[in-house]
Amino acid sequence: NVTFRNNTLNRIITRGLLLTIRGRAVVENNHFMSNSMSGILLSDDAKSWYESGACRDVLIKDNVFDYCGEVPILIKPENRVNGGCVHKNVRIIGNTFKKYSGEVMNIKCSENIEITDNIFEQSSEIKQTDCKNVVIK
């Protein structure tokens, strides 16, 4: 299990946080600011770097995403053909998304996703590909 809480990630030349863990992960009360890529990436890299696996229980709560160079929350396993959902049980709750005109989340091959009580200062676009049981409130 991992808890990542009360941090500021500012001007990182890659993604702010690469998260791949089968246990419980809590990402709470962080500020992702001016990172070159996504603020948070959930990957499942079985194609190139082989450095990560599927996530099974993730809470992303009360964070601020302030101008990330790419989509702030990217949930994207590196599969080319959908062979079923990879990431499961992801809750994205009470976050603030600033300065975005495009997608604020891009979610692929995932199930049991809850997106609730987030603040979108500009765009609230959420892209979903091959997902099951996604709830947006």
Show the residue positions of the predicted features.
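Short "repeat-start/strand-capping" segments in structured domains, especially the N-termini
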Residues: 2-3, 21-26, 56-59, 88-89, ...
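Extended beta-solenoid/beta-helix repeat architectures
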Residues: 86, 99-101, 109-137
